């Protein structure tokens, strides 16, 4: 409802993870897949690169509530382990009728036209400069930025953010943001990053959950 677009990265955590995103009258939510090359999965039978994204677009105001994301740990690829749903702020009472009108779409991309840069790829690994830190690399579509020089806003719910840089990669058509996350003893942290311009956000708000494994 706030017209802020969030891109929450999914991860294979070893423990159950539940995330809740508060909103009022959400414009849409779902599970989207952007890695569309065979090389991303190398599975000639399942052909994961051809799997559709699922998107729910509410048709009426749903009021206040949360989009809840559940990530269930699994031992193999055959178990479906990602769940996303809307939970109203007010408790639903037994015997009452509630109407939630929506459009459910299955397509390569969600059927919207948000005029901001989308996250193309997320990568992470141990920092080469700090053995206790982890490096995150986020690539965005470059075309949306034009001549604007965005400023990265990076946050962590626990721990701290170390060195970061923003780099244009015109040959790849990407804008790359890289930063170090330092846990500082934290066992869990929600990380976020957005690229801002003079008029506000120029990109999706990237969100990831880090857990100490």
Language-model features, listed with the residues they occupy:
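A contiguous, surface-exposed recognition patch within enzymatic or periplasmic domains that forms
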Residues: 1-99, 105-107
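Surface-exposed coil/turn segments at beta-strand junctions on protein surfaces, enriched
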Residues: 93, 129-131, 170-172, 184-186
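C-terminal structural cap/anchor segments
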Residues: 98-150, 174
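Solvent-exposed serine/threonine-rich low-complexity stretches and specific carbohydrate-binding patches
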Residues: 161-171
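Short, hydrophobic beta-strand segments
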Residues: 177-184
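Short, aromatic- and glycine-rich surface loops/edge beta-strands on solvent-exposed regions
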Residues: 186-197
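Short beta-strand elements
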Residues: 200-213
């Amino acid at each position: 409802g706030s017209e802020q677009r969030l891109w929450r990265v999914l991860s294979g955590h070893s423990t159950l993870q539940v995330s809740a995103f508060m909103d009022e009258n959400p414009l849409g939510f779902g599970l989207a897949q952007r890695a569309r090359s065979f090389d991303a999965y190398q599975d000639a039978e399942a052909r994961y690169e051809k799997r559709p994204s699922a998107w729910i677009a509410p048709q009426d105001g749903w009021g206040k509530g949360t989009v809840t994301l559940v990530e269930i740990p699994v031992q193999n690829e055959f178990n479906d382990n990602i769940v996303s749903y809307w939970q109203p702020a007010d408790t639903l009472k037994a015997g009452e009728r509630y109407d939630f009108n929506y459009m459910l779409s299955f397509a390569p991309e969600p059927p919207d036209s948000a005029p901001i840069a989308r996250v193309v790829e997320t990568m992470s690994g141990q920092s080469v400069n700090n053995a206790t830190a982890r490096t995150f690399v986020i690539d965005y579509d470059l075309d949306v930025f034009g001549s604007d020089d965005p400023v990265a806003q990076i946050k962590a719910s626990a721990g701290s953010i170390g060195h970061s840089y923003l780099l244009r990669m015109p040959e790849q058509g990407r804008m790359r943001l890289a930063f170090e996350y330092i846990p500082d003893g934290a066992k869990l942290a929600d990380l976020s990053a957005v690229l801002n311009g003079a008029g506000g956000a120029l990109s999706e708000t990237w969100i990831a959950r880090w857990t100490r494994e």
